Amino acid sequence: MQKVDQATLDQLVEDLNKEPNEYVVSKWIVEKIPVIFNGDYETFIKTKLSIANKLGVDSCSIIFVGSSCTGFSLNPDKGFKVFDEESDIDIAVISHHFFNIAWRWMRMQDVTLLNKRAKNGIMQHKKHYIFDGTI
């Protein structure tokens, strides 16, 4: 498993220690051209616009997150693993409309009617994501 270079980690640690959380999130995720675009701003913007148009949201509501954005995993269990061909691309859609639809759907599910795998998946999702504002 390839890991991120030490200089990048040192910069992240320095930012985490010296800067407000809002700055760190903006610099490393929200305001960053994701590494999957190799610095190609035009393709990045066109991709965001395409996704936003298909979902009916503003392109500012589309945020690439995770290792596809930073170039490495921020998950402490993954040891700063570098984004590679086996990595997925995580995209956050910031939308009250879609959040409410998903929230209602999730709350209305009768997990007793689902198979064990589906039931466990929904219960894990509720436990780890929903109450943090993520669906």
Residue ranges and their predicted role:
Residues 1-87, 94-135:
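Catalytic core of pol beta-like nucleotidyltransferases
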